[in-house]
């Protein structure tokens, strides 16, 4: 209920969950807070820093500007925006990608005379769809990974793309055809905080290119995890450390790029999952759900029910929660 209502910040709710489980004796301190030292949390923190360097140096801004520059019409511009945002969201923060490119798109809209609302809506949808391209594309992907690791299974780095890439392609095609006619044809009257595009002219070019090189090398290490024998979280940690040690990003900016709400929410969710498993409540809930679908429910029907339930809940609460 607290996750749905969000009367209390989600990060605080997660801490209440952890502390409450200890106070009530459901879990011991070590188990209740084990989620915060999970390997996937370390991966989260590392990739927030690696991705943050691309934003802080202006390299993400530059990539977005170069791609959109080649679009000659509004329709082509929408396609270009969705392609670059979708691909970047697959390996970087969805929110960060959108936040960095929104001022770029607003600037393009002002220069070209296009309505900003017609460009921003496809951008936001592309950021959401792009998160399904890789294991690190969205927090929910790593939560599922943590659940699988409990039974010695895991997703491949780009395994989500089997479903995510077709969704992104269909989304782009939709906005290039039918959706193009449905886009809002009005402009925003209020001047928002995103109107001012950040100036990166004083950032040395070597920092921009090194941030991109380290990101690419980090991703390659993750893709070939099994061959090189280095875990995802370690590859991410090495990339984050290199960025700080080489001076590409300062310690202050590195810490600023970490989304603490996501980290607390992730850790608290893992603790809650541990409590459900320890007490048998998880099995009880699962049996009740399966029982409502009959003695031997089809896995397709069960998946459909869970899918619809998630689709409904995500309209009222955080996707990650």
List each model region and its residues.
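Hydrophobic transmembrane alpha-helices of multi-pass small-molecule transporters
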Residues: 1-45, 49, 162-287, 303
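Juxtamembrane and boundary regions of transmembrane helices in multi-pass small-molecule transporters
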Residues: 76, 112-125, 130-143, 147-201
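Residue-level signal for pocket-adjacent positions within structured domains
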Residues: 3, 27-31, 87, 128-131, ...
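Conformational gate/switch positions in structured elements
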Residues: 7-10, 94, 138, 157, ...
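Transmembrane alpha-helix interface/packing and boundary motifs in multi-pass membrane proteins
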Residues: 1-8, 84-93, 125-136, 221-227, ...
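Short, electropositive, low-hydrophobicity segments enriched in small/polar residues
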Residues: 10, 29, 55, 134-135, ...
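Membrane-embedded alpha-helical segments and adjacent helix-loop junctions characteristic
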Residues: 11-12, 16-19, 23-115, 257-262, ...
């Amino acid at each position: 209920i607290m996750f749905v209502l969000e009367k209390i910040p989600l990060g605080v709710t997660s801490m209440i969950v952890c502390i409450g489980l200890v106070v009530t004796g459901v879990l011991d301190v070590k188990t209740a807070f084990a989620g915060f030292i999970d390997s996937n949390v370390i991966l989260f923190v590392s990739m927030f820093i690696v991705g943050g360097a691309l934003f802080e140096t202006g390299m993400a801004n530059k990539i977005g500007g170069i791609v959109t520059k080649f679009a000659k019409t509004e329709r082509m511009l929408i396609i270009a925006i969705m392609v670059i945002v979708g691909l970047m969201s697959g390996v970087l923060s969805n929110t960060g990608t959108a936040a960095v490119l929104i001022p770029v798109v607003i600037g393009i809209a002002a220069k070209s005379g296009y309505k900003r609302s017609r460009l921003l809506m496809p951008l936001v949808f592309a950021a959401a769809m792009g998160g399904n391209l890789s294991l690190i594309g969205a927090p929910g992907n790593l939560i599922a990974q943590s659940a699988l690791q409990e039974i010695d299974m895991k997703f491949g780095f780009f395994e989500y793309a089997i479903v995510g890439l077709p969704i992104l392609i269909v989304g782009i095609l939709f906005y290039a055809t039918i959706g193009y006619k449905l886009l809002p044809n009005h402009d925003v009257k209020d001047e928002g905080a995103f109107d001012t595009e950040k100036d990166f002219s004083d950032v040395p070019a070597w920092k921009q290119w090194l941030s991109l090189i380290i990101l690419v090398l980090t991703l390659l290490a993750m893709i070939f995890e099994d061959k090189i024998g280095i875990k995802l979280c370690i590859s991410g940690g090495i990339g984050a450390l290199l960025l700080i040690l080489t001076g590409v990003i300062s310690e202050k900016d590195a810490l600023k790029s970490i989304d603490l709400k996501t980290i607390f929410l992730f850790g608290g969710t893992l603790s809650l999952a541990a409590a459900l498993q320890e007490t048998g409540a998880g099995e009880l809930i699962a049996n009740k759900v399966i029982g409502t679908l009959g003695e031997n429910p089809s896995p397709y029907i069960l998946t459909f029910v869970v899918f619809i339930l998630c689709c409904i809940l995500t309209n009222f609460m955080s996707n990650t929660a």
